Every structure is written in C-alpha cells, then in structure tokens.
Amino acid sequence: MTVEWLAEQLKEHNIELTETQKQQFQTYYRLLVEWNEKMNLTSITDEHDVYLKHFYDSIAPSFYFDFNQPISICDVGAGAGFPSIPLKIMFPQLKVTIVDSLNKRIQFLNYLASELQLQDVSFIHDRAETFGKGVYRESYDVVTARAVARLSVLSELCLPLVKKGGQFVALKSSKGEEELEEAKFAISVLGGNVTETHTFELPEDAGERQMFIIDKKRQTPKKYPRKPGTPNKTPLLEK
C-alpha cells in the first residue's frame, strides 16, 4: 500500500499519480534496494521510509516551484537520483542531467532510467567543480541539489551551471536559515539573488525542510567554481 500512501499525500496538493507513475515508483524502490546490497546508495531502505523521505521529499519542491514546463534541470550530487528522478517521473517533459562524482552511482542511474523507460535524461560522471567550467556552464534553466553540502559550498557548485535568468533551487533540512545567512555573500559573488524561501514539514513528523529559490541575475565570474575540493575546504565567506 505504500505507493497508494504516496498517491493520497500528493492528492492533497492536487497532484494525481497515474498507474504508469505508480509502477515506476514501485520499480524504483525495488531496484534501489537490490542495488543497495551491492553498493552504498542510501541508508534508508524501509519501504515506507523510502516513499516518505526520498520520493515524497523529492516531489515536494513542486508544491512551490512550477516544474510543469519544458525546462532543463541539472541535479548536482544526486546520489541515487534524488530529487531529479522522482521529479522526472512526475513531470516527464523535464530534460534532466545528473552529475555525480561516483561512477558506480552513474551505472545504477543508467540502469534505472532504462528500466523506468525515461527519455531525455543523461548521467555524467564528473566533479561539479570541473563540470561547471566546461561546455555546460551557464546552460541550465534550473539547477538543484538536495542537502549535499553547506549552502555556501553548494552555491559555488551550482550557480555557475545556471543560465542567466534561470534558478538554483536548493533543498535543505531544518538548519537552512543559518546556512542561508552564511551563504548570502557567496550567492551574490556568484551572480545570484535569493528570491523565495519556503519552509514545510514532511508528513508524519518526519522533519522540517527548507527550500531556497535563487535567481541567476548576473554571469558568474570565470574563476568560479574553483578547483575540486577548494569550495568545501575554503567556502566563499564574507571576511
């Protein structure tokens, strides 16, 4: 009944799950657990917890941001595909690119996309710092990341990939406000401007989430992102 639980939760936000989408989520869960036995994809494997803390949590940004349009999305450090694969299942017209530094995860995502019959998805084995210096720099409508690093660090990894006029959608847990304050300098330096913040609770008291929508107002200076590892070691902070 877990996929039916997800359907009920989404219905409260006027989102209807089709039978195809239900089957896709069921397949996603099965493959996630199977592959997780061979490699570390997630510490969450209980079926209900996966639907709540991975699937629902990944779809929740669509309550506050319009993903129902033909936009290109880059998901930085998506791990087992969160949030972009659940979003792709819900909004099939999205063009999704996932960048991840671990090749094993890319292998899983390629197999997953094939089994789910997803079109317009690509998975790239690279560090975000290197990827952001290449041909895809400033080419995406939306770049997203889900709690992979502090916001000051995430901004340097993500904002260089956002096209001018696009958005960086940052998904954080409950300490997001502190991180946002610390990250404002970096966001400004990298050409961004925070335009919306949303705070919401997951169902069943599963925790608070915060979502920041950052508009790309100016081009990112060419020197960013810095070389791999530097953003994490020495984040861009106001001196």
Swiss-Prot record:
> Where does the UniProt entry say this protein principally localizes?
cytoplasm
Top-level EC class, please?
Answer: transferase
InterPro entries given for it? rRNA_ssu_MeTfrase_G, SAM-dependent_MTases_sf
- Which subcellular locations apply to this protein? Cytoplasm
The segments labelled Disordered in the record are 215-239
Protein residues bound to S-adenosyl-L-methionine = G77, F82, A128, E129, R146
Q: Which Pfam families match?
A: GidB
Please tell me one Gene Ontology term that the record gives under cellular component.
Answer: cytosol
List UniProt keywords, sorted A-Z: Cytoplasm, Methyltransferase, rRNA processing, S-adenosyl-L-methionine, Transferase
Q: What is its EC number?
A: 2.1.1.-
Q: Which GO terms describe its molecular function?
A: rRNA (guanine-N7-)-methyltransferase activity
Recorded superkingdom: Bacteria
The protein's matches in HAMAP family, at most eight in alphabetical order, are given as: 16SrRNA_methyltr_G
Q: Which family does it belong to?
A: Belongs to the methyltransferase superfamily. RNA methyltransferase RsmG family.
Instruction: Give the function comment from the record.
Output: Specifically methylates the N7 position of guanine in position 535 of 16S rRNA.
The molecule here is called: Ribosomal RNA small subunit methyltransferase G
Whichever gene encodes this chain, its name is rsmG
